[in-house]
């Protein structure tokens, strides 16, 4: 190579690298303005699923976040994880995700499959034998363990977590997302609980030998207690690695599918408490949009936290999560929606479906408030349709 050709060729290589980097991190169009979460407790039958999608479409929502994984069990026909306990771990005779996709497509709204990422089981008792076997029974080493090698204990009404520091756990969660986008015409995958869980923070999980070996190899630090900053950073990086592996798996299966995440209400709490560095995920192009869970009754605090989220998002798409279920006065919900949009959020998402309509597991109580919310809140959706 002569000096005269060396510079142009190097310049060409530099241009290619810049284009590749920009292509990985550029913000994609996220066509979401009015979204709503439908939880796994909002439906029990095929009729329930049809009614859910029918209601949200008629109300003017353009996007539904439809929960299909709760805690190592699922609400679709999977070859990887067993049916959910809500269906007695057996095929209920219909596929909720298939029905939801069909109904959403016919009504012109986008459906994102919502999964709880790290929860591995929920409740005070172990799961029964299932096919495929549930992780708690089949893969005890996948769960968080303390320094005495005791697995995170089961507890009433909350989750025990899979260990996101283990490569095999990250691979499994990514495979679930890949299975969904390969089998179903979803518009995207919506991640929840993509973090260390609040319960167990004081135990400083994980302390199992495999996790500590990985920490030592990757940081050249042998003792987390002697290097607390490196320990925190490494665990945060493992959550980011999980998001990256999910992104790669989804892209391999369906390049058009969006990847979004329900994230902690402020970046600082997310970063420091549950090791969820979601502003970094946005900047790296690992996710397409965030839904900060800004569930609050207080308007001033809501506004302050929305501003914090937007500042750290740096122009990337933010859909503000509104805790509609907390508001006995629909005026609070409307005010929060108005504030979020005025401050610069691309849109909002309501938590949750059962705030507006009687849902599968809910009783009839609260019918008057649900009706009032439908009358007062939902009409503002329609101009955007």
Regions found by a protein language model. Name each.
Residues 286-302, 309, 316-385:
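Substrate-binding cleft of secreted/luminal carbohydrate-active enzymes
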Residues 210-329:
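Glycoside hydrolase catalytic-domain groove-lining segments
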Residues 31-33, 43, 113, 118-183:
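Active-site-adjacent "subsite" loops/lids of carbohydrate-active enzymes
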Residues 27-48, 263, 325:
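Boundary/entry segment of secreted carbohydrate-active catalytic domains
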Residues 43-58, 85-107, 237-244:
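Aromatic- and glycine-enriched glycan-recognition loops and surfaces
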Residues 48-73, 183-184, 286-289, 347:
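Catalytic domains of carbohydrate-active enzymes, especially glycoside hydrolases
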Residues 77-88, 119-154, 193-224:
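Aromatic- and acidic-residue-enriched segments that line the glycan-binding/catalytic groove
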Residues 61-94:
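Aromatic-lined carbohydrate-binding/catalytic grooves of carbohydrate-active enzymes
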